[in-house]
Amino acid sequence: MRHLRNIFNLGIKELRSLLGDKAMLTLIVFSFTVSVYSSATVTPGSLNLAPIAIADMDQSQLSNRIVNSFYRPWFLPPEMITADEMDAGLDAGRYTFAINIPPNFQRDVLAGRQPDIQVNVDATRMSQAFTGNGYIQNIINGEVNSFVARYRDNSEPLVSLETRMRFNPNLDPAWFGGVMAIINNITMLAIVLTGSALIREREHGTVEHLLVMPITPFEIMMAKIWSMGLVVLVVSGLSLVLMVKGVLGVPIEGSIPLFMLGVALSLFATTSIGIFMGTIARSMPQLGLLVILVLLPLQMLSGGSTPRESMPQMVQDIMLTMPTTHFVSLAQAILYRGAGFEIVWPQFLTLMAIGGAFFTIALLRFRKTIGTMA
């Protein structure tokens, strides 16, 4: 009972110390509000509401089909212009794509002459230019092939392909960006808060006080883990409900309590990593450099931004030992696909095992170095 009381009281001390750190409080609020909102609404790498202009010099049934095939959410409604206005519009940056459909286009297509359509792209808008060029090519080819097939043969196709988008019917990037921002910020803040809590002890000269008190390194470490983990757990839950579900209007398919249980297990592992890094760094700037070196690979290779199947096999095997890989997997399964515990229990068990391993390593390191931190 005395050990639990010591852990609780030391944790309260950590929370009070955090309340006096305005920089950390600002980082916490920013990470789960502005950062989440901007990640969800920023212009994505995929095509979204790209401005497009079309000079239809043919005015045929086929050219009208091509014009009407560009619609939201990939393109804004096409602006109809003349060929003479095309260069001026691109120079002024009014649209990213400008399409010139030549005269007699439909007649030449039906005659098998393979006419050309000119597509002008503003390549300075790199986020849309490369992807949009492929979209436009596929759309035009699809409309031309469909028109020619129906014109020459009025029979219905034997097979009709019906595509349905699961879990994100409108392919809205905000559904992915907002949730992934929360997942990444949970890992980042868990490491930063626990590591900085240890650095603060060194900078404020309170390590000596801890050494003369009847407490153990285990109690000190557990106090920092539960207090900083509780902060991240609470603010991430509020951000998921208020920002993602409320402000952004993203539907949450699965159980939020089940997701928060996964967050707690992930925090057990990542806060232990923060303690370990805090024993290595001698100051806040050093901790910041270590966080960059550790956090970037954890986030980039965990499967959140790039599918793990696209990575080399060796990288996949190495990342299986990291908690973020399993946390991203269970978070996406619960929040996107509505998975229950019967599906994500392997990730839960793996997080418990990885968390126990990181906690043991951090505790051994902490016991070894606490005397030299004074």
From Swiss-Prot:
Subcellular location, record wording:
Cell inner membrane
Mapped to this chain, the residue ranges on the Periplasmic side of the membrane are 44-172, 251-255, 305-342
GO MF term list:
ABC-type transporter activity
Taxonomic classification = Bacteria, Pseudomonadati, Pseudomonadota, Gammaproteobacteria, Enterobacterales
| Family recorded in the similarity comment | Belongs to the ABC-2 integral membrane protein family.
Recorded protein name is Inner membrane transport permease YhhJ
One Pfam short name? ABC2_membrane_3
- One term under GO cellular component: plasma membrane
Q: Which residues lie on this side of the membrane: Cytoplasmic?
A: 1-22, 194-229, 277-283, 364-374
